From Swiss-Prot:
<dbReference type="GO" id="GO:0033468">
    <property type="term" value="P:CMP-keto-3-deoxy-D-manno-octulosonic acid biosynthetic process"/>
</dbReference>
<dbReference type="GO" id="GO:0005829">
    <property type="term" value="C:cytosol"/>
</dbReference>
<protein>
    <recommendedName>
        <fullName>3-deoxy-manno-octulosonate cytidylyltransferase</fullName>
        <ecNumber>2.7.7.38</ecNumber>
    </recommendedName>
</protein>
<keyword id="KW-0808">Transferase</keyword>
<dbReference type="InterPro" id="IPR004528">
    <property type="entry name" value="KdsB"/>
</dbReference>
<keyword id="KW-0963">Cytoplasm</keyword>
<comment type="function">
    <text>Activates KDO (a required 8-carbon sugar) for incorporation into bacterial lipopolysaccharide in Gram-negative bacteria.</text>
</comment>
<keyword id="KW-0548">Nucleotidyltransferase</keyword>
<comment type="pathway">
    <text>Nucleotide-sugar biosynthesis; CMP-3-deoxy-D-manno-octulosonate biosynthesis; CMP-3-deoxy-D-manno-octulosonate from 3-deoxy-D-manno-octulosonate and CTP: step 1/1.</text>
</comment>
<dbReference type="InterPro" id="IPR029044">
    <property type="entry name" value="Nucleotide-diphossugar_trans"/>
</dbReference>
<dbReference type="GO" id="GO:0008690">
    <property type="term" value="F:3-deoxy-manno-octulosonate cytidylyltransferase activity"/>
</dbReference>
<keyword id="KW-0448">Lipopolysaccharide biosynthesis</keyword>
<dbReference type="InterPro" id="IPR003329">
    <property type="entry name" value="Cytidylyl_trans"/>
</dbReference>
<dbReference type="Pfam" id="PF02348">
    <property type="entry name" value="CTP_transf_3"/>
</dbReference>
<dbReference type="GO" id="GO:0009103">
    <property type="term" value="P:lipopolysaccharide biosynthetic process"/>
</dbReference>
<comment type="pathway">
    <text>Bacterial outer membrane biogenesis; lipopolysaccharide biosynthesis.</text>
</comment>
<comment type="similarity">
    <text>Belongs to the KdsB family.</text>
</comment>
């Protein structure tokens, strides 16, 4: 099995301007992500960015980069542009790794690609067990429920499945059946081509979860429990400070 990693790295960020170039121990954040992807055994790693400064930083680090349009509404649309420009075949496996995940374990990048290759779905992703009630009831922690074969039934910011008997007594403890979705995806390139032709779905717009578009149009998403739990991504200056501290100790 071979696969390509594409790393969407949008320059603008309301909470952390210029985020892909944020310095972490002497390297831009996007370069750390690129190196993690290279460690996964990917045949090819491409950074997809809308800003020439990011392009320069990636090239200086010896990486491959595609300068994309700046008007994409999502990372998936940016991914689709790269797929078309590079001429990937419909069966090629593409892994989408977020450009703000400098601590992502390389093992799960390979895992999601292997899971897609072994499944009948056009798309695969990962999840980790939820262990605290705080996380189970946190709308920023996206929950997922699956069928018996590991295909997603639904993703939600709500607490799903609702443990009726337990929660009628107390919401301070939870069972072992909650899963938190991790935002890493593998796709077949042909699936991405279809995806970007679909109009946004009602559920997607209500929950603000792009992956619900896939379920809305009757497609399957394979979900597996991740072999390693990724650390915090970088959305805020506080996140950046924490990641710098963690990486300084490695």
């Amino acid at each position: 099995m071979t696969f390509t990693v594409i790393i969407p790295a949008r320059f603008a960020s309301s909470r952390l301007p210029g985020k892909p170039l944020a310095d972490i121990n002497g390297k831009p954040m996007v370069v750390h992500v690129m190196e993690r992807a290279q460690e996964s055994g990917a045949q090819r790693v491409i950074v997809a960015t809308d800003h020439p400064d990011v392009e320069v930083a990636v090239r200086q680090a010896g990486g491959e980069v595609c300068l994309t349009r700046a008007d994409h509404n999502s990372g998936t649309e940016r991914l689709a542009e790269v797929i078309e420009r590079y001429g990937f075949t419909d069966d090629d496996i593409i892994v989408n790794v977020q450009g703000d995940e400098p601590l992502i374990p390389s093992v799960i990048i390979r895992q999601v690609a292997e899971n897609l290759a072994a499944s009948k779905a056009g798309m695969a992703t990962l999840a980790v067990p939820i262990e605290t009630s705080e996380e189970a009831f946190n709308p920023n922690a996206v929950k997922v429920v699956t069928d018996a074969e590991g295909y997603a039934l639904y993703f939600s910011r709500a607490t799903i499945p609702w443990d009726r008997e337990r929660f009628a007594q107390s919401k301070e403890t939870i069972g072992d059946h909650f899963l938190r979705h991790i935002g890493i995806y593998a796709y077949r390139a042909g699936f991405v081509r279809r995806y970007v032709t679909w109009a946004p779905s009602q559920l997607e717009q209500i929950e603000l979860l792009e992956q619900l578009r896939v379920l809305w149009y009757g497609e399957k998403i394979h979900v597996a429990v991740a072999k390693a739990v990724p650390s915090v991504g970088v959305d805020t200056p506080e996140d950046l400070a924490r990641v710098r501290q963690v990486m300084a100790g490695q």
